Amino acid sequence: MASTRLPGKPLADIAGEPMIVHVWRRATEAGVGPVVVACAEPEIAAAISAAGGQAVMTRPDHPSGSDRIFEALESVDRESAHDAVINLQGDLPTIDPAIVRAVLRPLADPGVDIATLVAPITEAKECYDPNVVKAALSL
């Protein structure tokens, strides 16, 4: 919600629904298991609930999304029944559900503990933009 470039971004209206609801729908359409939105803002939880989804409120002071997910897991998966978690950012309203499924494929290898989706940088200016996340790969 505290985006400096677009304050309130998760609730930005896209075709009559908040952005976060579009992301939740894409994740649900992937069919990979339960989808829970971890959030610190009651407005986000209310939007997800109104759409029929499940949201878990977390502390607002987490330094990362991974920390927020860990807190949410402590309440929704107390028995550690799930062996994988997908950390899907709330600002990807058009993500293809097939991409969500694809991130699980590497985890079928017992030697793999984590998988991250990346895409090639297509414009030179993105190389120097601090708002574009980069990944170093060895292929």
Predicted features by range, described:
Residues 28, 74-78, 108:
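Residue-level signal for alpha-helix termini/capping positions
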Residues 32, 80-82, 109-113:
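Short, high-confidence coil segments that cap the C-terminus of an alpha-helix
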Residues 95-139:
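Conserved core of the sugar-phosphate nucleotidyltransferase
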Residues 1, 39, 89, 118-119:
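Short beta-strand/turn micro-motifs composed of small residues
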Residues 36, 42-88, 92-102:
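Short phosphate-binding loop-to-helix
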Residues 1-39:
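N-terminal glycine-rich phosphate-binding loop and ensuing alpha1 helix
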Residues 15, 59, 118:
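Residues at the C-termini of beta-strands that transition into short coil/loop
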